[in-house]
Every structure is written in structure tokens, then in C-alpha cells.
Amino acid sequence: MNRKQGMDLTHFATMGTTRRSVLITGALGSVAVFAGRLPPAFAAEKPKVGLVMKSLANEFFKQMQAGAEEYASKNTDKFSFKAVGMKDERDFAAQVDAIENFVTQKYNLIVVAPADSKAMVTPIAKAVKAGVVVINIDVELDQEAKKAAGIDLAFFGPDNRGGAKLAGDALAKALGPGGKVVILEGNPEADNAQQRKKGFDDSVAEGKLVLLDSKTAHWETEEANTLMTNFMTQHPDIQGVMAANDSMALGVVKALDAAGKSGKIQVVGFDNIPAVQPLIKAGKMLATIEQYGAQMAVIGIDYGMREMAGEKFTGWVKTPVKLITAKELA
């Protein structure tokens, strides 16, 4: 399976708590089947599964952790589990330490959402060469860096460019041609930030919008608040904002509230964290993108167990995204 011919899991794109549980239950059933075919080396004791996430200050990763822990609690007879997150979005050293610690502690499977698509390849390659099964979720590792390190890992995650374009297109439709917008980017070193920027740029071009400015706020709420305040000073005619995640969208709305412009400038985000849903209902945000973070970690564990059972996955195993507006939240 090459990069363009990746397996597609978008049939899991369901909405609401009940349907989310269905996905988790379905994946749980898969692990129950595949765990029964683990190699003899794992028969003596349960496999140890580690999850390495980005910042737990970001509600998206809190949801990811909760989903994984719920899943693990229902599979205590199949594997032991530990989740580790960073204190903020640029705490790369914490991710490196977590992976190295899991290897030292002889974990069998590590599921990782890398904060840096290139820098994280080296510790991940060491884990792979130590015999650990590694599953890359959420943020794709750099292809050339993987090749240079001699590893071939599948990517289990969303179409970040396509998801951002869904949000950007919703904004373009609301503003019409000539609408003046700014973009708040994620960490420049992360592939998902790069892909979301491309998706927003696609919407700007196709919707004939005017891009006034585009800068990074490194996924962080307070940094986004400051950046948006500066944007409004530099560009008082802003009509719309594309934020590459909801944490930054929260910072944007905070800045708009302080300036008395909330609801007057349209805002789109990405992640569908609980905190933005009332803002969308109230008209302070136009839309966000659901990318099913809780299920993403479960899918990573599921496919990792399958790899330990002898299967091999390459390329891109696509997970779903969906545009969320006030209509979906009604």
C-alpha cells in the first residue's frame, strides 16, 4: 500500500457519544481476536502498551487519553497500558524521554502522536530497531527522515489538508469572494500543521479570499490570543480567521471578546473539543473539524496488536474528519 493508496477508515465517521462508543467497541472486538494470535514470546505475560501524546493542556489530547484508557480498562486481560503527554506543545524532550523510557521498560507496543515530524524519527527508529512495534498516529512522520533512518511505518491519521479545506470552504462560503482573512498556524515542524496550512491556502485560492496574514501560534491558546490581538491592530479590516486547532481558536475568540468584535469576525478551528461547541452554538465560531481523537488512539492500539500478531501495514491508513457547524450541534 503506497502513500496515495492508503486504507480508508472513514466509514467510522459517526457523530455523538453513542456512536463513538460503537467504534471503540468494534475496535475492542478486533483486539480480542488478534490478541489471541500473538506470537509465543508474548504468551507468558501481557503485552505492555504505551501511548505518547502531545500537550495535555490541549483538550484534544485529553480526549485521546480518555478514549485510550477506557479501551484499555475493558481489555485488562489482553494488555497493560500507560499514557504519557507533554506539558505544552513544544516540550519535544518529554516525548523523546517517554519513548526511551518505554523502550527501557520493555514495552511491546508504542503508539505515538509526534510533536515534531522530523526530530521524533530518531528516537522512534531506535525503538523499532529494539524490537518494539511503533504505530504513528495523528501527525505523520517525515517520509525522507524515515527513509534515512531505515524505518517504514504506516501513518494512521486524518486528511489534515482535506479537513482544513472543509473548514476553510465553510468560511469562504460565509464571507464570499474578496473576504479578508488571517491564518493561525500550528507548530511549523509538525506535518499536520503544514497540511492544515495547505488546506486553508486551498480555500483562500478557490474561494477568492484575500489573505492578510499567516503566522504560527504553536497550537497554544494564550499565544493565539496575543497574535490575534496584534492581527486586529495591523489589519483592522479582518473578516475571518482560520485557526489550525481549537486551542488557538479559543485564544482568537478571547481576543475578539476583549475587542468587542465577537460574532462580527467569523472563526473556524479544527478538533471539535468540547470548549468550542457552545461558542459555535452562540455564533462566536462558525465551524470546526471533528477528527475523532478518542478513536484514533484506539485504532492505533488495535492495529499495533495486529502488527504484533504478524500483520504489516504501510502507507496511510486514513481516519475520518467531519465539518461541525451549529447545525450538527443542534
Predicted ranges, named:
Residues 1-36, 40-42:
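N-terminal secretory signal peptides
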Residues 12-14, 24, 43-330:
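A residue-level marker of the well-folded mature domains of exported/periplasmic proteins
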